[in-house]
């Protein structure tokens, strides 16, 4: 009984403290038509301290959404256009010799920002991708003999085009795993596209002003950590990830020859973090199974390796995750 009272009090507190989420979403809706899933995914990454990889054809508002979110928060934003001739120094910076001072001085790269948009990340060679992904993991950059901490909050939002293969360098599985979410962006609905046309041909450009400071996001992350996850939900999360490794143990023998490798413990951690933040966005103080299911595809689709047999049969990671969610017992 005492626990239910605690949960009720926590729920009321989270509902009060998460009110800024509505303001952020309203600000995003002023500029972005539709794309609710994209907006929610960006907020999950922001409040979970996790990086986001967006995949979709050009023109689906990926860059605009990221730029709008950065504008709503009074924080430093930078955009890196990844190209085949890009160098690691173009991303993280370098040491430049100053003839005036007769010494090397630090020239910090665009990665030193709160929001970093890595546009078309799969167009740059592996060594450039590695430079960014190492900064994502370590939250610091070494230039010369000095190590510089990246600003807080630090969020990388990367985009890639799934169609064009020529002149691209696919991200290795180990590096893709550093992204908390991989979000597939779909086309807008019919009515949404009519509204997009109307806004653009009328020259309507909505300008958004900052409604939060960078420190507010750091405080919000502390509040998110208070969202309650029951042991049954934790077990459910682990069961889902284990089913990607040992499908036969969950009566999914048909998946055994389709999965080359399953999710690592990082998958379980990120699934729990994302579900908790999703509950917070929905202004709830506790996680329910539907929260886990809502974020499972975005957390797992880039962490489930497919065999040649799966690729030959046109079976996607999303289909495998869907089968697992349908089979694993819900608490």
Feature locations, PLM:
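Short glycine-rich substrate-engagement loop in P-loop NTPases that contacts/grips substrate
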Residues: 86-115
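Conserved AAA+/SF3 P-loop NTPase catalytic/coupling segment centered on the Walker-B
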Residues: 110-137, 151, 166-175, 187-195
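AAA+/SF3 P-loop NTPase mechanochemical coupling elements
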Residues: 105-114, 143-160, 171-180
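Walker A/P-loop
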Residues: 46-83
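C-terminal engagement/docking regions of AAA+ P-loop ATPases
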Residues: 1-14, 247-331
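Pre-Walker A (pre-P-loop) alpha-helix and adjacent loop at the N terminus of AAA/AAA+ ATPase modules
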Residues: 13-60
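P-loop (Walker A) phosphate-binding loop of NTP-binding proteins
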Residues: 57, 91, 159
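Conserved C-terminal "switch" segment of AAA+ ATPases
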Residues: 13-18, 31, 168, 182-254, ...
């Amino acid at each position: 009984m005492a626990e239910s009272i605690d949960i009720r009090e926590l729920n009321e507190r989270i509902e009060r403290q998460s009110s800024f989420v509505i303001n952020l979403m309203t600000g995003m809706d002023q500029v972005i038509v539709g794309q609710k899933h994209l907006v929610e995914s960006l907020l999950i990454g922001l409040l979970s301290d996790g990086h986001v990889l967006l995949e979709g054809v050009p023109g689906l508002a990926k860059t605009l959404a990221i730029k709008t979110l950065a504008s709503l928060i009074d924080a430093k934003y930078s955009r890196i256009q990844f190209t085949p001739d890009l160098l690691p120094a173009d991303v993280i910076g370098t040491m430049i010799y100053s003839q005036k001072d007769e010494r090397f001085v630090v020239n910090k790269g665009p990665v030193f920002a709160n929001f970093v948009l890595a546009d078309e990340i799969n167009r740059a060679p592996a060594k450039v991708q590695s430079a960014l992904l190492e900064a994502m993991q370590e939250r610091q950059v070494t230039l010369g003999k000095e190590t510089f901490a990246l600003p807080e909050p630090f969020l990388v939002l990367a985009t890639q085009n799934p169609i064009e293969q020529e002149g691209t360098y696919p991200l290795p599985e180990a590096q893709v795993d550093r992204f908390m979410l991989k979000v597939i962006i779909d086309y807008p609905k019919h009515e949404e596209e009519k509204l997009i046309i109307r806004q653009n041909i009328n020259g309507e450009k909505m300008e958004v002003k900052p409604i939060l400071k960078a420190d507010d996001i750091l405080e919000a992350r502390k509040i998110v950590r208070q969202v309650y996850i029951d042991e049954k939900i934790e077990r459910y999360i682990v069961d889902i990830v284990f089913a990607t490794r040992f499908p036969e143990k969950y009566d999914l023998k048909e998946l055994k020859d389709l999965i080359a490798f399953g999710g690592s413990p990082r998958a379980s951690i990120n699934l729990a973090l994302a579900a908790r933040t999703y509950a917070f966005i929905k202004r709830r103080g506790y996680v329910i199974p539907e929260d886990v299911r809502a974020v499972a595809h975005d957390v797992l689709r880039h962490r489930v390796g497919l065999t040649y047999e799966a690729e030959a049969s046109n079976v996607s990671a999303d289909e495998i995750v869907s089968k697992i969610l349908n089979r694993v017992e819900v608490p």
